[in-house]
Design a protein with these regions (language model features):
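Carbohydrate-binding surfaces of carbohydrate-active enzymes
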Residues: 1-179, 184-192
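Short, charged beta-turn/beta-strand-edge "cap" motif at the junction between a beta-strand
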Residues: 195-196
């Protein structure tokens, strides 16, 4: 699609966001608007398991919500055992006006199985409140190590890292990354594969 790849064949960020949202195993939230600032909201959380990966297996879906200072506003964990439902409503996240009063809100959803994070997705809202506010948020540091086509990214800072991505200047039209524009918590590492040696 031309919307995900530009004229020169360079993959746009939206490609990676769509890739996450159409994964066969995903935890998702539904929003009826993108500006939640200073409003009471109830947001439904769903587990999508197209291939029944979690069938008869215990799992957790952890939801973490952060404000523009990257302080935790709320967390909630849904515990379950996989079944034959492809779409399963896990519950609702209720936030009051004080919790949503922020120029940015970030929602991070993790699926945990056998104490291992097997999926992560994140959303951001309230960006219309003060356009450009994301550039004044707390910063962190990322360490990158590369061996062949394996790249390890580590957040060595004190704040979450949002939208971490790999670029290879002069070869962007050839680059494909297994996962890009990711969320990394402090001291967390992620191993990615790239198609370039």
């Amino acid at each position: 699609s031309w919307s995900c790849v530009d004229y020169y064949g360079i993959i746009k960020p939206v490609h990676y966001f769509v890739q996450k949202s159409f994964a066969p195993l995903a935890a998702v939230m539904l929003f009826d608007r993108s500006n939640l600032a200073s409003q009471e909201v109830s947001l439904p959380v769903y587990l999508l398991d197209d291939c029944q990966t979690l069938e008869k297996e215990p799992y957790q879906v952890k939801v973490s919500i952060y404000n523009a200072l990257l302080d935790t506003v709320a967390t909630h964990t849904f515990n379950g055992i996989g079944d034959d439902n492809v779409v399963k409503k896990l519950g609702e996240i209720n936030l009051n006006r004080e919790q949503t009063k922020s120029t940015m809100l970030f929602f991070v959803l993790d699926i945990i199985k056998d104490n291992k994070n097997i999926y992560r997705n994140y959303y951001f809202t309230n960006y219309e409140v003060r356009p450009g506010s994301i550039v004044s948020m707390p910063q962190t540091e990322i360490k990158m190590e590369r061996t062949g086509n394996i790249v390890t990214l580590t957040n060595t800072g004190k704040h979450p890292a949002i939208g971490v991505h790999v670029e290879v200047p002069e070869k962007m039209d050839q680059l494909i990354v297994s996962e890009n524009y990711i969320w990394l918590n402090p001291q967390e590492s992620k191993i990615l594969k790239i198609n370039l040696e």
